[in-house]
Structure formats: structure tokens, C-alpha cells
Amino acid sequence: YRIYSKIVGAKVVFSKERNFKVSNDEILKKITKRTKIVFIANPNNPTGTYISKNQLLDLRKRLNKKILLVVDDAYFEYMLNEDYKSGLELFKNKNNVFILRTFSKIYGLASLRVGWGYGSKKIIDALYKIKPPFNVNKIAQQCAVESLKDKSFVKKSVKHNLDWAKKIQKEMNSYNIQTN
């Protein structure tokens, strides 16, 4: 998203992380009068860390109402932790939050470049003003729709990836490499 931000002339500012985790306090330190958007990938790629439900709610509460909080839920299917909730679950009817999802990860459709966003009508209307026509082709659309029907593939993929994550974590720990 950094490239798109620069195209439209936005200044991208990164906040410090603490132990590879996003910190609300560090984000808030970077907020200025000119801040328009705070963007969070939750869970984060590549660290795999995440912001808990309470942290995410706290961040939205502490941000100025005029600042849009964008939550990228690209990997939410892999989150089994009890203290995690997807952005969509937390902010379904909020005006100043926009949720992103992708078909690239769990559905394996990365090359089709298809996903979706959820937000208020005001945000959607603004996006339609800048959206190019024909930005997602019919084949990609049909693949996305069909992939939503295959619930067993999603379950199998989550299990496969989590099993491998445990194996990798165990191997790394055997070399005294700490993981999250």
C-alpha cells in the first residue's frame, strides 16, 4: 500500500513495534493534524503477530473520529486465538473503519488480484470515484464466488498451514530461536 500512497501524494509514516508487535501508543505518537488514515494488517505479515480484540477497539477509540482506520484482515482465517476478532466482527457498522479481505491467501487466488472491502457508503462512494472500470475481470470474479463455496478446502488449508507452523516453530526452538 506504500506505493499507492505515494502515487496520490500521501506521506507514509511507520510506527515502532515492540517485540515485532504493533503498539497503540507508538501509533498514536505518530498521529498529526494531517493524518488521514491508520492502516493495520491484522494479523501481521510477515511477523504473524496480531492485535487483540481489546487493543483494536482501544485504538479506534483513541483515534480522532476523522481518521479512517483501515484493517487488512488478509490472514484472519488462520487466527484461532480467543483474544482475536476480525475487523469485520468488531467494526461492522462503524463509519470510520474500512475492512479489507483478499482471495489471495486462504483461497489461493493470488494471481487473480481479487478481494473485497467493507465500509460505510461514504467510503464506498469515494472509492468508486477513483476505481478504474473493469478492474477485476469476469474470470477472477467467478473464481472468487466459487471459492467461497468450498468450505472444506478452507478448513484443510488452515489445518495444513498451522501444522507446518508448529513444525517450523519446534525446529527453530531447537536452535534457541524464539518465535511468536
Where do the protein language model's features map onto the residues?
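Active-site pre-lysine segment of PLP-dependent enzymes
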Residues: 22-34, 46-69, 75-106
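Short glycine/serine/threonine/alanine-rich loop segments
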Residues: 10, 67, 177
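Short beta-strands and strand-loop turn motifs
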Residues: 14-15, 37-43, 69-73, 180
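PLP-dependent aminotransferase class I/II
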Residues: 96-173, 177-178
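PLP-dependent aminotransferase-like
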Residues: 1-40
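Short, structured coil segments at secondary-structure junctions
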Residues: 8-9, 93, 175
